[in-house]
Structures are given as C-alpha cells and as structure tokens.
Amino acid sequence: MDYLLISSETDPASQNLKKHVENYGYSVFNIEKKSTQTNYSEFPQSEMYIFLSKHASESKKPTLTVHTPGNLTDDNSHGGNPEEISPCNPVFNTLMLQNMNKYNEMEEYKELGFDVSFEVLHHGPTDLKAPSAFVEIGSSEEQWQIDDAAEIITNSLIDTLNSIQNSEYDEKEKIIGIGGGHYSPKFTKLALREEYYVGYLTPKHAKLSENILNQLTSKQEFDFIGIDWKGLYGEDKRKYVEFFDENDISWQRV
C-alpha cells in the first residue's frame, strides 16, 4: 500500500509527531495550512492519506485517537464540503487503535494517563479519493508537546503500516458503526476486543441523510452495518433500518 504521511506547520502536535516519524526514517509531506482546511488537489496521489494531528476538546483529557474525516451534515465550518465523507480503510483504523492501546499500556507509557479511542466522522478534508485517517494527540497544548505521546503514535503507525504492507493481519468482518457518542465507546470496545475491523463511525446526534447513507455504504468495504441500538433515537433507527432493508444492506444490533 502506497501511503502519504501529512503534517501541518500550524499544528504543534503535528510537528511533534513529524519529528518522531522522521527520526525513524519516514518521509512526511509538509503543509502550511490547517490539515482540516485542505483538499484533494493539494496532495500527490496516494492509496492512503494519514494526517498527523492534534486533538482538541474542552475537557483537555489526555487522549490518543484515530478517525476518518468527513462532514455528516451541511455544517462544514471545520473544513471540507457539506455532506461529504472521505473513503475509509477499516483495517488501518482498527489496527492503529489496537496498536496505540498496546503501547499506551506499556510500563514506560502507562503513567502518562492517556485514553485511547476512535472518534466519529468529523471535519475536512472530505474530497479525498483514497482512504484517509487522522491520528491524533489530545486534548490540550500540554499533551500536544509530550514526546512520549508522539512516540506511542509513531510506533503504532509503524506497526500498523508494516502489518498492512506485509498482509500480516487476521481476516475479520469489516463493519460500519452507527450510534453512540463522539468517541464511539461501543465500537472502540469491539475493536479493542478484536471482534471486527471497524471503519466509519457516526454519532447519535447526527441525522444521516440518504446521501450520507449512500456514501457510507459505497466508500468503505464492509460486511454489515453495526447499530448501537441503545445509542440512537427511535425515529432515526427506523429510518436507517428501512434504508438498509430496501437496499439489501446487511445490518446487526451490537
């Protein structure tokens, strides 16, 4: 798999990650603007786009995350196009999550106190023609500068890329996860239990249009849709299930 590692000069966590990745001999494509404000035309062609990035939240909780970019609604205030999502590689996202968790639990890193989780689809860029993922250090400036946090992600990234390039990973069902909160706790747990390769994730609060449902089921390879049954409003459940049934798309409660 050909891949492009991308770092933004505006992002301190991204620059921290870039330093560590380059220390291992990997090349990084540098951009001058925010990663979320970029688009497909600004990058060389690749089979996978991997953005080295910060994660910000009001809680400032130490968190390491991985997610695919995309806007599930008309709101594109954080880059990208309205109601558009970039393609997703569920194997990459899940192996990356598992590897971050593995390193995070090692004795030399455990005291840092980081959580490891997925995030749902959000922000740009949304028009990429190949799978993409953001790998992130969060959630405040203090964490963005931590070398050991960058080392966890760098080692996880190297292990993930090596596994994919050498086809050294087990065959498992690939799923799309619908429902739950922003950090998708249900699907994070399923992935860490190594039950599935989890790709696209959407939250309870997003009202998914037919346009988005069509993109979810056409831009990622998947075996079935996993529905967090308690993590959706009843009205939305009925709408989504009706769409899946009408289009012969397999789904399961999880």
From Swiss-Prot:
Ranges of biased composition (kind: Polar residues): 65-74
Keyword vocabulary terms for this entry: Hydrolase, Metal-binding, Zinc
Note on how the cofactor is bound: Binds 2 Zn(2+) ions per subunit.
Reaction(s) catalysed by this chain's protein: a D-aminoacyl-tRNA + H2O = a tRNA + a D-alpha-amino acid + H(+); glycyl-tRNA(Ala) + H2O = tRNA(Ala) + glycine + H(+)
UniProt cross-references to SUPFAM superfamilies, sorted A to Z: AF0625-like (SSF142535)
Cofactor needs: Zn(2+)
The UniProt record lists the keyword Zinc: yes
Annotated region described as Disordered, given as residue ranges: 61-82
Intrachain S-S bonds: none
EC class: hydrolase
Biological process per Gene Ontology, one example term: D-amino acid catabolic process
Listed GO MF terms: D-aminoacyl-tRNA deacylase activity; zinc ion binding
Enzyme Commission code: 3.1.1.96
Family label: Belongs to the DtdA deacylase family.
Protein task: D-aminoacyl-tRNA deacylase with broad substrate specificity. By recycling D-aminoacyl-tRNA to D-amino acids and free tRNA molecules, this enzyme counteracts the toxicity associated with the formation of D-aminoacyl-tRNA entities in vivo.
Database matches in PANTHER family: D-AMINOACYL-TRNA DEACYLASE
Protein name: D-aminoacyl-tRNA deacylase
Gene: dtdA
